[in-house]
Structures are given as structure tokens and as C-alpha cells.
């Protein structure tokens, strides 16, 4: 049985999945939470860090944690370049909420600073993470970013920022390609999971996505 720990890091969620003494960390949050996450990881034999996409609020601690724990990192194919060059991020806000998120993110000079690291793995649709001790399947969920991915663990789906749950489940408030984001939302609904876990916001039963406005 897979154990799940939700690591709340301000407005960002990281997830620790564990089974039979092996753990995988999903996303790494921002600088101020690195010691909190490191302490949890040290107690849980984390073998891999998976990054759902290449935005700073999800990858700022990847280099630090990878070095401290001596473990590999993985990111979706297509997002690796965001690690090295924030200027290529062609993200657009959706509505007032999206504009507000973008404004406050850019107001923090540290937000776009990411310590460099070279991902050990580039993940794509259908990849399995069994070699790290957990039966997780990778799903490609482009839209928010080109290389956004999710992870399926039995009835649980971890969607990163492919969907958000700030006030209610919705498409991402920021995206590179809205049409792709809509396709990814439809794909998530079609996966048949029971619980959806977001990069931002509380988890919901999958049936709540039936009223998603696309």
C-alpha cells in the first residue's frame, strides 16, 4: 500500500509517496521550505525527485535536495530548458486571478532564481517509476507548460499545475497554451482516478471535475 504525505509549503504542495521503505518526492517548492522538506526526506529514504514542470515554485529546491540526499531528479521532456533560462517561459495569465498571480510572483526578485541542476531523467507519457520502488505511471499534461507531467498512483492522480484548486478546481490560471491545457484537463478526467492532487490547492474527489469549466 502506498502511503501519502502532503507537504504544505505556503501556496505550493509537495507530495511524498512511500511504499516498502522507498519514497518518491513530487516537487520541491521554494527556498524558505528547503530545510522542512529535507528533514522529511531524510526520514523516508527518498530515492527520486520528480518535478511536475519547470516553474521556480516547484523546482527551486531541486538542486539542494538532490545534492544533500544524493538522489536523481526527473522532469517532463520539454521543460528541462526552463531550468536554465527563465526568459523562454512564454506563459500567459488567464483572467484577473492569473494576472494577480503573475504580478505578485514577479514582484519577488528571488522567485525567478533557480539554482542550476541537470535532471537525471526526462520523463514522457507511459514511463514507469517502478525501479524506484513505487508503481507510478507518468502522464503527459501539456498546457501550463510544454513539458508538464502528472503521476498516476492507483486511484490517485497528481496533476501539478495542469489543473489548480485555488477557489475551485479549474484550468491553470497561467498557461503557455490554453488549447493544450483543455486537452490535458479532459485527459485527467478520462483517466478514471478517484482523487486529484494539485500543485496549488486541496485535493478533491475526481467526480468534482465533472463541473470543470473548459
Give each language-model segment a name.
Residues 2-6, 26-29, 49-52, 135-141, ...:
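Short, flexible loop segments at the rims of nucleotide/cofactor-binding pockets, characterized by
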Residues 24-26, 50, 73, 158, ...:
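Residue-level marker for buried hydrophobic side chains located in beta-strands
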Residues 1-44, 150-164:
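Conserved beta-strand hairpin/beta-sheet module of binuclear metal-dependent hydrolase folds
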Residues 135-211:
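Metallo-beta-lactamase
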Residues 17, 27, 37, 53, ...:
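Divalent metal-coordination and catalytic microenvironments
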Residues 41-44, 129-134, 191:
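Glycine-rich phosphate-binding loop signature in dinucleotide/nucleotide-binding domains
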